[in-house]
């Protein structure tokens, strides 16, 4: 007998669909406690009290050389708005006699270590740690980069508690130099795109080895950590499920395929309704960064006239697309919206498109 499923009535209806033959394999991937819809526990990942005290961004964000604290924020905050930044950069509160930061870096939530990179030169992240949080829905990752050192004994598969020390803030990096006076913690919250990332990576022929497996930064899509934390503090949202549900759509597209991407299997909280008995495609809603935050399964009747494995853009917020210059999701060609380069990358990773 299958036990009663957890969560809200809507959540239970969605999870119910995974009991079908189509969904049973994916059901095994559901995180423990994924249906819990209460208020999550999350903390600022450094000792600085500035954000907790409600002080302005200049008191806790590290600028990227411009002197403007906004350049340490999320999104198109650099190079006059055309350079995208996946997370936020948090400045140190204390330094040692050599001027090196001495702040501990904490786990923002309880979770499981998925990746530890102790070699500073192997990534633009420098030394970094990735946690996955299976007790929240969707089961986001958090990432902690540019560390001076990683806490002893921290390895993939280790369970960590909220506020557990992961390492020491630093300015490690690969391929470029972060000056000591701009040392910081690069902090991300987001979703992992595909378990088939290596196939996508190999097809791109980057000319370098993937040293980080699934937790390569190219396989990770972040949300704005500061925006989430501020909405959570103000009690506008209690958890990530509520936060994703109120995201602003930038692009809505339809993809005709009988395939269920592993992204959906891992993040069933993003399903808008249960799967039909015979899946014919997906309607996918993306925010301005291209993150696919809402998935609606389609029946054959809903896909009439559309071509298999060819994305069809059915709605584009043209104003938002023009405003956000660090991402290109949609391009007008011959009077028709088509996927831009950043949306193409998302679809390639999700569906194995070439």
Show where each model-derived region lies:
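Bacterial N-terminal signal peptides that target proteins for export
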Residues: 10-22
């Amino acid at each position: 007998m299958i036990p009663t499923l957890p969560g809200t009535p809507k959540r239970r209806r969605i999870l119910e669909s995974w009991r079908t033959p189509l969904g049973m394999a994916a059901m095994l991937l559901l995180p423990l406690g994924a249906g819990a819809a209460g208020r999550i526990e999350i903390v600022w990942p450094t000792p600085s009290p500035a954000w907790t005290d409600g002080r302005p961004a200049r008191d806790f964000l590290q600028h990227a050389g411009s002197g403007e604290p906004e350049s340490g924020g999320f999104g198109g905050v650099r190079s006059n708005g055309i350079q995208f930044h996946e997370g936020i950069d948090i400045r140190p509160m204390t330094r040692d006699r050599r001027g090196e930061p001495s702040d501990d870096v904490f786990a923002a939530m309880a979770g499981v270590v998925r990746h530890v990179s102790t070699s500073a030169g192997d990534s633009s992240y420098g030394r970094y740690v990735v946690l996955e949080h299976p007790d929240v829905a969707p089961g986001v990752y958090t990432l902690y980069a540019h560390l001076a050192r990683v806490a002893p004994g921290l390895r993939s598969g280790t369970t960590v508690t909220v506020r557990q020390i992961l390492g020491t803030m630093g300015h490690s990096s690969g391929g470029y130099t972060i000056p000591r006076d701009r040392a910081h913690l690069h902090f991300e919250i987001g979703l992992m795109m595909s378990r088939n990332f290596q196939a996508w990576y190999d097809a791109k022929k980057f000319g370098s080895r993937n040293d980080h497996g699934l937790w390569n930064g190219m396989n990770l899509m972040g949300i704005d950590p500061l925006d989430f934390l501020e909405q959570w503090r103000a009690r506008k949202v209690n958890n990530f499920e509520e936060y994703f549900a109120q995201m602003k759509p930038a692009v809505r597209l339809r993809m005709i395929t009988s395939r269920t991407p592993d992204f959906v299997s891992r993040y069933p909280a993003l399903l808008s309704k249960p799967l039909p008995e015979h899946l014919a495609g997906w309607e996918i809603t993306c925010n301005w960064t291209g993150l696919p935050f809402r998935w609606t399964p389609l029946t054959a009747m809903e896909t009439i006239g559309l071509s298999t494995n060819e994305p069809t853009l059915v709605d584009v917020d043209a104003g938002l697309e023009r405003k956000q210059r660090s991402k290109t999701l949609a391009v007008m060609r011959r009077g028709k919206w088509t996927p831009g380069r950043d949306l193409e990358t998302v679809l390639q990773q999700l569906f194995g498109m070439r």
